[in-house]
């Protein structure tokens, strides 16, 4: 089990950790720091937006693509810590994590509710939380970790909810050790009917619609070369240090 002492290897010295429950720690003084998921539409999101047929029909990809990306990320190195920034409920990736216990993994999210759902998913698959994994209640936009702590950073579906992504990408790059890699997914406009749906969510303030040119212009400005593939309205991205 990754305990507080082990976590101190990667947690910034000025960050205080609070034990919440077995396998879950928080960087906050109490549980009142809530994400929009906690406050608004969590159950609906987990039931609808995580449905594989919904994602295939509307957005043009299979949720199994997340599993494949996560497996590739975990296999990208044989050593070093892994960070999943904004891990959510592990709706798409729990099986990938449950099947890979070689590397130490920090699963970070600002929603304590989502972390508990993620924990329950791992327990359902494995009978317990794998000893190489720990949950941290914290903000992916202000990573509470020492620089260059992680060999692999994963972040699924976080970029498209941010008005500006430069700061988050810089945070991730600062947290990446030499020879490491970042793996990301984000919804984009891609000349499909679902673009209208994306813009509708944009007007509601839930997502920020971008096309591929606008997205990758930010990576280029940060001198972060990327490899990517696009399926429907989803971009699957990797960037090496």
Model-derived features with residue positions:
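Short alpha-helix
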Residues: 206-223
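Short catalytic micro-motifs in class I SAM-dependent methyltransferases
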Residues: 157-158
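Class I SAM-dependent methyltransferase SAM/SAH-binding core
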Residues: 81-142
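A conserved beta-strand element that flanks and buttresses the S-adenosyl-L-methionine
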Residues: 154
């Amino acid at each position: 089990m990754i305990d507080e002492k082990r976590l101190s290897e990667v947690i910034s010295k000025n960050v205080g950790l609070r034990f919440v429950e077995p396998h879950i720690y928080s960087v906050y003084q109490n549980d009142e720091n809530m994400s929009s998921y906690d406050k608004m539409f969590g159950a609906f999101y987990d039931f609808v937006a995580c449905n594989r047929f919904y994602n295939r029909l509307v957005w043009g990809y299979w949720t199994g693509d997340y599993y494949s990306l996560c497996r590739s990320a975990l296999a990208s190195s044989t050593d070093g810590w892994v960070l999943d920034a904004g891990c959510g409920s592990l709706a798409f990736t729990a099986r990938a994590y449950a099947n890979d216990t070689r590397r130490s993994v920090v699963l970070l999210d600002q929603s304590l509710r989502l972390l508990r759902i993620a924990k329950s998913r791992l327990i359902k698959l494995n009978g317990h939380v794998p000893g190489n994994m720990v949950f941290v209640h914290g903000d992916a936009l202000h990573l509470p970790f020492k620089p260059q702590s992680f060999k692999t950073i994963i972040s699924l579906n976080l970029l498209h909810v941010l008005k500006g992504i430069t700061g988050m990408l810089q945070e991730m790059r600062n947290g990446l050790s030499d020879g490491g890699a970042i793996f990301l997914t984000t919804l984009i406009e891609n000349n499909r009917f679902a673009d209208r749906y994306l813009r509708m969510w944009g007007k509601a303030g839930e997502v920020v619609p971008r096309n591929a040119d606008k997205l990758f212009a930010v990576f280029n400005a940060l001198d972060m070369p990327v490899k990517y593939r696009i399926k429907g309205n989803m971009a699957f991205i990797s960037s090496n240090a």
